[in-house]
């Protein structure tokens, strides 16, 4: 249990044994209460099979690099010229006194989106040949609360492995590789391998080609073929728009046994690279009674590529029709909370913490994810053949992928060049289902093969 902590005010390296004995007291004291208090009758036949011998160190020594990842890098989502990885976990801080503290076991502060991690934080300032990853990187105590998690550590491991290979091949130091003229080769190596670096593009060697495709899907309507769902919580339909594109009117099948008022808002993100719905663009209300199709119209034209939220307020007396159709880059999110890591559906800055206030919009994991049925008065061109060459491998600000028409029996792509090209290999990137909300396979997967 992560909250069985103690030792934050001690030297976790040289006083590890002292910490171990106190943690054992805590573990067996908790177990004694579970077994003998009478509050947990289901525990009568349970036993503890094993308790660790070595304390797990949440935080210990860190090295100092040529830069220090800090809170502002995370909250302000600062871009670094040498960005090589990303993080997304909250700044997750635990009280130094552990279980004996009067404070909650943890306090989490979220940024509005992913942040980048600079390569200069991944090597030692004082040792020419030492690369750092995991929980050793150059970061402040506060920033460490986010960058320490295992998925981020794994991403950094890939970066450091690639960097070590380049340093060895070119006989240079990590600090030399971090120079602006050199670090781009590391970034491009990572992107070619499928790594994600926010707001970085892969320089595509086939970008000089002309692309012809058999067809391209345009979003006009999603059929109502999956039943009805009451609006049990505030939710939103995510739709991307291209710069200069107007949001067409949208109609949805709704029903209510008695007359109800439904409040609908149009939201977007101040930072177009985010999907946090922190900026209100427009709102309107509609009167719902019986079962019919209702029309929503917002006069909005996008100033840049960005995602929009068409948000529906909670009203369990109103039901909306669902669709079985799933399309890349179009999905539902919910203004809800994950009770494991949050107590509210909105981040509240109730002190001088230097963080933002905003609503949490969460997708649901398969098979619990849903999508509203709807129709657009004018089709949206969400998937483009140009995206096959734009060097963006994730749905950042737009879908960044091509989708053929649903009735295209033999979808195909043709690349043409004015001159003969020589190629050693071709890499095809298929849909990796980035809309699927799965932090790690440990969460389980409803579509697992085995």
Model segments located where?
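Flavin (FAD/FMN)-binding glycine-rich loop and adjacent Rossmann-like elements that form
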Residues: 1-246, 257-290, 299, 312-349
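A broad, low-specificity signal marking well-ordered, structured residues that form hydrophobic/aromatic
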Residues: 46, 130-131, 308, 413-415, ...
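Juxtadomain low-complexity/linker regions and immediately adjacent membrane-anchoring helices
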Residues: 198-218, 324-397, 432-448
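Aromatic, loop-rich ligand-recognition surfaces of beta-strand-rich domains
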Residues: 238, 244, 248-274, 327-329, ...
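Long, low-complexity, Ser/Pro/Thr- and acidic-rich intrinsically disordered regulatory regions
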Residues: 250, 309-310
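Trp- and acidic/polar-enriched beta-sheet ligand-binding modules for extracellular glycan
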Residues: 277-304, 313-316, 406-410, 432-450
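Short, conserved beta-strand segments of beta-strand-rich sandwich/propeller modules, principally
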Residues: 307-309, 425
């Amino acid at each position: 249990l992560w909250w069985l902590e103690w030792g934050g005010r001690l030297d976790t390296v040289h006083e590890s044994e002292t910490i171990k004995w106190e943690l054992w007291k805590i573990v067996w004291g908790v177990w004694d209460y579970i077994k003998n208090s009478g509050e947990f009758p289901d525990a009568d036949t349970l036993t503890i099979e094993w308790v660790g011998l070595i304390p797990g160190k949440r935080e210990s020594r860190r090295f100092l690099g040529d830069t220090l990842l800090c809170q502002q890098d995370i909250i302000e989502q600062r871009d670094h010229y040498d960005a090589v990885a990303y993080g997304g976990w909250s700044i997750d801080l635990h009280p130094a006194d552990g279980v004996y503290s009067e404070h909650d076991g943890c306090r989490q502060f979220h940024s509005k989106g992913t942040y980048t991690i600079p390569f200069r934080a991944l090597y030692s300032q004082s040792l020419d040949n030492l690369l750092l990853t995991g929980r050793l990187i150059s970061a402040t105590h506060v920033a460490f609360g986010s960058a320490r998690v295992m998925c981020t550590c794994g991403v950094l491991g890939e970066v450091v492995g690639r960097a070590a290979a380049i340093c060895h091949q070119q006989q240079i130091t990590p600090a030399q590789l971090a120079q602006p003229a050199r670090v781009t080769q590391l970034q491009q190596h990572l992107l070619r391998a499928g790594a994600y670096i926010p707001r970085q593009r892969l320089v595509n060697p086939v970008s000089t080609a002309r692309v012809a495709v058999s067809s391209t899907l345009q979003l006009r309507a999603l059929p109502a073929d999956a039943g009805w769902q009451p609006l049990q919580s505030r939710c939103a339909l995510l739709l991307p728009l291209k710069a200069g594109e107007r949001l067409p009117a949208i109609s949805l099948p709704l029903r209510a046994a008695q007359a109800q008022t439904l409040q609908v808002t149009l939201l977007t993100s101040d930072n177009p690279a985010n999907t946090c719905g922190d900026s209100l663009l427009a709102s309107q209300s509609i009167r719902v009674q019986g079962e019919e199709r209702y029309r929503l119209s917002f006069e909005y034209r996008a100033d840049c590529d960005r995602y929009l939220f068409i948000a529906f307020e909670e009203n369990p007396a109103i039901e909306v029709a669902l669709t079985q159709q799933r399309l890349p880059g179009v999905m539902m999110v919910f203004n809800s909370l994950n009770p494991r890591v949050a107590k509210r559906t909105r981040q509240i800055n109730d002190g001088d913490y230097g963080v933002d206030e905003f609503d949490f919009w969460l997708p649901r994991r398969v098979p619990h994810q849903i999508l509203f049925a709807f129709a657009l008065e004018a089709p949206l061109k969400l998937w483009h053949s140009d995206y096959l060459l734009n060097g963006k491998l994730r749905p950042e600000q737009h879908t960044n992928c091509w989708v053929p028409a649903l009735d295209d029996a033999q979808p195909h792509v043709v690349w043409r060049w004015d001159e003969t090209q020589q190629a050693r290999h071709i890499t095809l990137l298929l849909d990796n289902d980035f809309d699927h909300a799965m932090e790690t396979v440990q969460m389980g997967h409803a579509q697992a093969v085995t």
